[in-house]
Amino acid sequence: MLKSFRTEIHPTAEQKVRIHKTIGTCRFIYNFYLAHNKELYQNGEKFMSSSKFRVWLNHEYLPQHPEYLWIKEAYSKAVTQAVNHGQTAFKKFFNHESAFPKFKKKGRSDVKMYFVKNNPKDCRCERHRVNIPSLGWVRIKEKGYIPTTKEGYIIKSGHVSMKAGRYYVSALIEIPDNKTADLSNEGIGIDLGLKDFAIVSNGKTYKNINKSARLKKLEKRLVREQRCLSRKYENLKKGESTQRANIQKQKLKVQKLHHKIDNIRTDYINKTIAEIVKTKPSYITIEDLNVSGMMKNKHLSRAVASQKFYEFRIKLKAKSRENGIELRVADRWYPSSKICHCCGMIKKDLKLSDRIFRCHCGYVEDRDFNAALNLRGVKTYKIA
């Protein structure tokens, strides 16, 4: 089984320059590949695959344009992967899975430095450092997090990324499959919401982390820093003495706050999933939420986005598969909140403001807990 491990690294000043150059080259090549195929289409020529583009770039374009020879200074595997990502984006567009590929702008796009194991000396890992091709040994912040080479684990591939002035490495490692877990407990249903993050049918409720005092304080601070950044831009437009270096410093402050808030939410999701999986249920049932539709409501869009429902589903799916737990997904139109768990009657006039479910049979229960109980016993579902 292949598993990804992501942690922060502490590269030297020289390694940082190398990372910046490689990521910049990857972004340039990705944009160049999109622009070249766009030009071919406008001229009525055939689409150029990633392999043909690399041959054309190395044997035709670069010899005629020596000013772009700096492309060859970057790690070749990372550049190749950038072209492959461009081809994947085009394939998704051709298959009507996504929109037309967009160019990646400097500072606003998530571009990574890809690396792969070519020989036994590449991609070795020790407790406190990891060997990355073209960078050498790089120190790891969280010592012992990535399985080491001495323990028999092999890094197949990975990538280096940057976010808010911090550097991360993600390594793909082959680990042995876990033995079938003893799933002696009954299945559970999970209802996701905005008032509380998750309500489980076993009675456990996970609160909305966005309502905590810590996150509210950080969000207020973020508003102040964003206002300060906006004023600097306005002063620059008016021609007043605002240094561009100060704008970059303020922008980094805003990025770090965004990153910190995002990390708190992600950490809460990870801990919630770990606690749910530790109960060893025979199966877990969730509902197929229409998040994109919920985001269209201007009154709820911000609250929905901050809950990160999709990330919860993806990570729960991976953790369930790792522990041999069946993850069931109920139909999107299954009325889990409107069905009485006691008699099965559907209460069609239930409003979103009704937090207590009251049935004519005398059954009274919290709306979200009633939905979790219904999800636990749903008969029609898909296996995630």
Q: Residue locations for each model-derived region?
A:
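Stable alpha-helical structural segments in soluble proteins, enriched in small hydrophobic residues
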Residues: Y33, A78, A82-F93, R367-K379, ...
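Well-ordered beta-strand positions in beta-sheet-rich domains
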Residues: S4-E8, W137, S157, G187
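Positively charged, helix-rich recognition surfaces that bind polyanionic ligands
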Residues: K3, T148-E151, K163-A384
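Gly/serine-rich nucleotide phosphate-binding loop at the start of the catalytic core
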Residues: M1-V79
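Acidic carboxylate diad motif detector
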Residues: K52-R166
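Long, hydrophobic, amphipathic alpha-helical segments used as structural scaffolds
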Residues: L34-Y41, F90, F94-P101, I175
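Ordered, soluble secondary-structure elements with a strong preference for glycine-centered loop motifs
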Residues: A13, V17-H20, K77-T80, V200, ...
